[in-house]
A protein has these predicted regions:
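Short, well-ordered coil/turn segments that N-cap beta-strands
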Residues: 77-80, 106-108, 135-139, 164-166, ...
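Active-site mouth loops of central-metabolism enzymes
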Residues: 83-93, 142-150, 208-213
Length: 220
């Protein structure tokens, strides 16, 4: 899986160069996806178990089917959000700019990768700035709940404003952090952090996982 690829790549570079710089880590997130087989080998989406019930008298015209939805104050042509992508490295900028432009053209939403790099390396902010390429897109900012716990709301609000985001995704990723060399180990205070941001920020706050799903217990 992608976690294995990331761990293998990061562990090798950690051994060669010491702890990875935040920009190098972001580059290492791109490399496995471009060159390795990162899909699950055994797990599936379970869609193979879905059987659609055929309706013989639908009483509709196909051309009148409307997939558009309203999400976070903006209308999407379909309930699709390309998220969360990348940022923090010059190669990441091209990915963000290209996909954001596609999302803008097709009426989808677009989510940035973790903006932690912007805090640690302000010179990387441009890799997250996609409004020039996607002026109308529903744009979601991104920060990890662990990092947000240590940041004041004013700092996060400034990061959101700098990229012109319509909302903030607070990502939850303990599984990835546990297997990533140099990853976080303190996951306390997450619920309180999200509640604080919901109250303090001028934009909606969304909780999202990075790939392992949200259990019913966590959702409640």
């Amino acid at each position: 899986t992608i976690l294995v690829a990331l761990v293998t790549t990061a562990a090798k570079k950690n051994g060669e160069h010491g702890k990875l710089d935040i920009t190098e880590r972001k580059a290492d997130h791109l490399d496995p996806c471009a060159t390795d087989a990162v899909a699950f080998k055994q797990q599936t989406t379970l869609l193979e178990g879905v059987r659609l019930v055929h309706q013989s008298l639908p009483d509709l015209h196909v051309d009148e089917i409307d997939l558009s939805v309203s999400l976070l104050g903006k209308k999407l042509r379909a309930p699709i959000v390309i998220a969360a992508m990348t940022g923090g490295h010059e190669r990441a900028a091209e990915v963000n700019h290209t996909l954001a432009a596609i999302a803008n053209e097709r009426g989808y939403g677009f989510g940035l990768g973790s903006q932690r790099a912007m805090q640690k390396r302000p010179d990387t902010a441009w890799t997250f700035q996609v409004r020039e390429h996607a002026p109308d897109v529903l744009l979601l900012g991104n920060v990890g709940v662990v990092q947000a716990r240590e940041m004041d709301p004013e700092t996060i609000a400034a990061m959101i404003h700098e990229v012109g985001a319509d909302a903030l995704c607070v990502h939850l990723n303990p599984a990835m952090e546990l297997v990533q060399p140099g990853g976080d180990r303190d996951f306390t205070g997450g619920t309180e952090t999200i509640a604080r941001l919901v109250k303090a920020l001028p934009v909606p706050v969304v909780g999202k996982e990075t790939g392992n799903g949200i259990s019913i217990e966590t959702a409640r």
